[in-house]
Amino acid sequence: MTDRAMSYPRILADVGGTNVRFAMETAPMRIGEITAYKVAEHASLEAAMRLYMLTRSGAARPRHAAIGLANPVTGDQVKLTNHNWAFSVEAMRRALDLDTLVAINDFTSLALALPYLPDASLVQVRDGTAVATAPRALIGPGTGLGVSGLIPAPGGAVALAGEGGHIEIMPVTDDEWIAWRAAHDQFGRVSAERLLSGMGLSHIHAALSAEMGTPLEVPLAPAQVTDGAMRAGDPVCRRAFDAFCGMLGSVAADVALVLGARGGVYLGGGIVPRFVDALRASTFAERFVAKGRMGSFLADVPVYVITAEYPALPGLARALADRLEADARRAETSQS
């Protein structure tokens, strides 16, 4: 195992639909030099990473990097779902003169980060007692809807890589049905992400406005809907917000049931941390256990909101360390 193979610093990049956040890991889990760029302001991820490498203060050249992407990562070729960036992981590694470039789904990296998040960055919004040896579920509305889980396994926990945000969603209340039907008329199939995301919150509000006979020429931005619900006392914004929280409770419970997540459910993404108190006061917790015969299974499952500003970065560091250790073991085996 060479010094270069395990060297620091290492670049970490968390790529969302709106922003890309770069950081430098200078020692195990020592993460700093965090810089955020707007995705729309850069022609490619490679260009954004080059800019970050040019502007960082450290003298040592990074040899290894990990990127988390709000996108399925199933091979070398990557095309972002919510932006026009597309690239080959291997070609970008060579272009940036890196020894290692790991690409994983952003919610896979966030799941890997769960054991490293301090208690101060977690706000419990539903009572319960986590079972330390049980799976944990992760769901997060943002530009899209991320879903993952952390599953205990021999040798360390395994983070799931999937696209659970695109499962079907089942409305319950009248307002939810109004939003669902409007989405169905527009898109055909209605995934959970269509309603449980930033664009989903805007869509719910627009659908309710149209149902009331006051269609909008331009939908409100998600922040406008939440502001209208919590501060301005707008009744349509309030109904949209309530529908959003109720459906989030239902879908979070579905993910918990699939994974057997007695280790807790974690809410990430860029939306929910903005209204933690309002989520507590909503129907989220009620809908979380409204699962018929399985309500008793969910009754003691705690739910936490992740409030850390850059929560996925420790998970990227973990994924990169795991890859380097695996590569080193393979190299040692081939030489023996």
Curated annotation (Swiss-Prot):
EC number: 2.7.1.2
Reaction(s) catalysed by this chain's protein: D-glucose + ATP = D-glucose 6-phosphate + ADP + H(+)
Binding site for ATP: A13, D14, V15, G16, G17, T18
Superkingdom assignment: Bacteria
A GO CC term assigned to this protein in UniProt: cytosol
Pfam family name, one: Glucokinase
Annotated NCBIfam families: glk, PRK00292.1-3
Similarity-based family: Belongs to the bacterial glucokinase family.
HAMAP family, per the entry: Glucokinase
Name of the protein: Glucokinase
Organism expressing this protein natively: Cupriavidus metallidurans (strain ATCC 43123 / DSM 2839 / NBRC 102507 / CH34)
